Amino acid sequence: APARVVGRRPRVLLGAAGSVATVKVPKLALALAEVADVRVVVTEKAKTFLAKAEAYDAAAWATFQASGIEVLSDADEWDAWQEIGDDVVHVELRKWADLLVVAPLSANSLAKLANGLCDDLLSCTARAWDFDKPFVVAPAMNTAMWTHPLTATHLADLRVLGVAAVPPASKKLACGDVGPGALADVPAIVTAAGAALGEAW
């Protein structure tokens, strides 16, 4: 287990991939921000769903917007780098964070992380991750995707690296199907994040 962070608040990097469950990211980020410093990285597909978060939970969205929690995406990586010697955002995020949490983790991003692909800010940060520090994922996808054999294979590959997975919940999904694949609830993800850091959150 990693040494507990001493002398300052833990730093949690929250990644969100292209799942409709991204509408829950403001609430999750706020819950984590009660106990840690938080920054958020969204994929381009996740931005589509984050834009729907206000309609999903207006109160959480308003608090999130007022919180000052930084939200980064691919454009920030490219805007920050103009010439050799400039900061590389995914490398800086790796240095900054004590913990990487990807919630929701889509089927596509799961496949990318398990196979080492790195074509956006989130996957580049994961590919550069220091595995002496904890890494937690919370998958969220349609039941058919969740039960696909490759999903178990990809999660097993991540576990070999030391990545902890918060299993999805079974419920009626956004697509109308009933079954496993829903993002775990916010308290479960926060608890897993704390456990990864040796904290009882």
Pin down the residues of each PLM region:
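A cross-family phosphate/adenosyl-ligand binding-site feature
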Residues: 1-137, 142-201
